[in-house]
Regions:
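Membrane transport/envelope proteins' first extracytoplasmic loop
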Residues: 1-185
Length: 185
């Protein structure tokens, strides 16, 4: 299941806000992340291992388990000379690379969708298990949500109109920081 789009808001949505936004015919999925600087001079956007939408494709190794394992984007690994079993360090914490993955919503590694060139040398994406993700302080979380349409759009015009409805609903409920429908990604 690949998202139809995602958005980021300033503060975590509460149940009432999620319910209101979902009334436009979507299902919302938490897709929170942190941006973690590593000692090798790079930054990884770290997500909790996804279960329902934008699920990882394991290219080699295994998905991370425990609190010291991390699976990283294959292209980021290649460009930084990293392989399964290597150690990455961030803020004094050592992470063992358990696997190399691809995330369907990051086929090109843009840290910001306004960038004109993707950067798989300095930026990458990664996943960690729920118990590892829970160790990040809440004030570091970026509140991103992915959505799927309850009834998929029939044509490009409907794709754009439905995305506009989602954006309007989010704007009525929260402070929108970014909004990326699939057709712009």
């Amino acid at each position: 299941n690949v998202e139809y789009g995602n958005f980021r808001v300033e503060k975590k949505l509460n149940k009432a806000q999620k319910k209101y936004i979902s009334k436009v015919g979507i299902s919302l999925y938490d897709n929170f992340y942190v941006e973690e600087p590593f000692d090798n001079g790079t930054t990884l956007r770290i997500f909790q291992t996804r279960q329902q939408v934008n699920t990882p494709c394991l290219m080699s190794g295994s998905l991370p388990i425990g609190t010291d394992q991390i699976a990283i984007d294959r292209m980021y690994a290649d460009n930084n000379g990293l392989t399964v079993g290597d150690i990455l360090t961030s803020n004094g914490k050592n992470w063992t690379v358990s696997g190399l993955i691809a995330l369907p919503d990051y086929s090109a590694l843009f840290q910001d969708n306004n960038d004109t060139m993707f950067d798989s040398l300095q930026f990458g994406v990664a996943i960690v298990p729920e118990e590892s993700f829970a160790q990040f302080s809440e004030d570091r979380l970026l509140y991103s949500y992915s959505w799927l349409y309850d009834t998929p759009p029939k044509d490009e015009e409907q794709v754009k109109n439905m995305a506009e409805d989602v954006m309007t609903a989010v704007n009525q409920e929260a402070s929108l920081e970014s909004f990326v429908p699939r057709y712009l990604n």
